[in-house]
């Protein structure tokens, strides 16, 4: 236990695990971001990084939680989409996020839920880093109703 008088934050994400026949469940783990390396995103001029808490190729996991960081001036320079819905919780800083047809100002403490195939982009104007938790379902087919 900590003897510090500083306030801390804890994010607990709960979901029902989606089993797949023939794939064993991953073991539970707790990890601090200091244990993960920053992976620079391609063609970002060292302004856009992602910390991955699990190996992206490990299909036992049915969700990922990453930390995305933009340095001032960092951008997602194109409207991208994803096949899965995903959540974003802003940890630090301010930016404008392109969601579908709108640019929305976001800052620390904000939460975004993005639908599948929602066009998105980001511009982090500064003055400091812009960081967020990125949650997304992975490695499972979307069920048809």
Task: Indicate where each model-derived feature is located.
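A short, N-terminal "cap"/entry segment at the start of jelly-roll beta-barrel domains
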Residues: 1-62, 145
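Conserved hydrophobic/aromatic positions in well-ordered beta-strands
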Residues: 66-68, 88, 133
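Ligand-binding loop in jelly-roll beta-barrel domains
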Residues: 1-10, 116-142
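A generic fold-level signal
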Residues: 45, 58-62, 82, 106, ...
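A short beta-strand-loop-beta hairpin characteristic of the jelly-roll/cupin
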Residues: 75, 81-108, 118
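A generic structural signal for short beta-strands and their flanking turns/coil linkers
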Residues: 61-66, 86, 93, 128
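Conserved short histidine dyad/triad with adjacent acidic residue
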Residues: 47-54, 66-82, 103, 116
């Amino acid at each position: 236990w900590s003897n510090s008088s500083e306030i801390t934050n804890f994010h607990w994400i709960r979901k029902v695990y989606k089993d797949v026949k023939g794939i064993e469940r991953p073991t539970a783990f707790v990890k601090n971001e200091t244990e993960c390396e920053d992976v620079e995103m391609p063609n970002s001029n060292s302004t856009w990084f992602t910390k991955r808490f699990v190996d992206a190729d490990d299909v036992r996991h049915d969700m990922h939680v990453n930390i995305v960081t933009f340095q001032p001036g960092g951008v997602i320079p194109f409207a991208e989409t994803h096949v899965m819905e995903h959540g974003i919780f802003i940890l630090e800083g301010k930016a404008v996020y392109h969601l579908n047809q709108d640019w929305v100002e976001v800052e620390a403490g904000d939460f975004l839920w993005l639908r599948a195939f929602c066009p998105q982009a980001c511009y982090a104007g500064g003055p400091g880093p812009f960081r967020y938790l990125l949650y997304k379902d992975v490695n499972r087919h979307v069920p048809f109703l």
